[in-house]
């Protein structure tokens, strides 16, 4: 499929996106997610990169004494492997992601999980940085200020998801 079609699968829960885009039932979508994850774990997991300036930013924030956590829609297991592989896990106090069993798949659920694990409870001191509309919407639903970035997959839509 064309790249713009594949981009629709980045961000939202995969099973929901398969059902929507492929017009299939839940069971078939779950099977497709399983097949995708098999491929991803073997071949696709490290087929990405760290954007320029991100490592330096993480280092600066960590040296300033900030607590840095990750809330990703990617399965937590994969997120931790990627963070280790690319050398930025050391900057994070917590890496939280989706559950492989489907119990925590929506961005808001991941954010709730991460917030529950954080020592900081004052939402005024917490910021969500994201490159997809799902990041911004999830943060807004939890009462967290969000910072949208344009270097990721959302491109120049301003986080609208359009």
Give names to the regions the model predicted.
Residues 57-83:
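Substrate-recognition element of Asp-dependent hydrolases with the DxDx(T/V) motif
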Residues 127-162:
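Acidic, Mg2+-coordinating phosphoryl-transfer loop and its flanking beta/alpha structural elements
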Residues 1-55, 77:
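N-terminal helical cap/lid subdomain that shapes the substrate entry/recognition surface
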Residues 34, 89-104:
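A short, structured active-site edge motif that brings together acidic residues
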């Amino acid at each position: 499929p064309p790249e713009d079609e594949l981009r629709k699968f980045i961000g939202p829960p995969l099973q929901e996106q398969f059902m929507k885009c492929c017009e299939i039932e839940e069971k078939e979508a779950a099977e497709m997610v399983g097949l995708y994850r098999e491929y991803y774990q073997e071949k696709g997991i490290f087929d990405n990169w760290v954007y320029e300036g991100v490592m330096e930013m993480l280092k600066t924030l960590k040296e300033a004494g900030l607590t840095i956590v990750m809330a990703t829609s990617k399965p937590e297991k994969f997120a931790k492997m990627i963070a280790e592989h690319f050398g930025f896990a050391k900057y994070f106090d917590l890496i939280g992601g989706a559950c492989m069993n489907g119990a925590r798949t929506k961005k808001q659920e991941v954010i709730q999980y991460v917030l529950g694990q954080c020592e900081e409870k004052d939402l005024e001191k917490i910021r969500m940085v994201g490159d997809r509309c799902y990041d911004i919407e999830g943060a807004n639903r939890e009462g967290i200020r969000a910072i949208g970035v344009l270097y990721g997959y959302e491109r120049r839509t301003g986080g609208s998801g359009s």
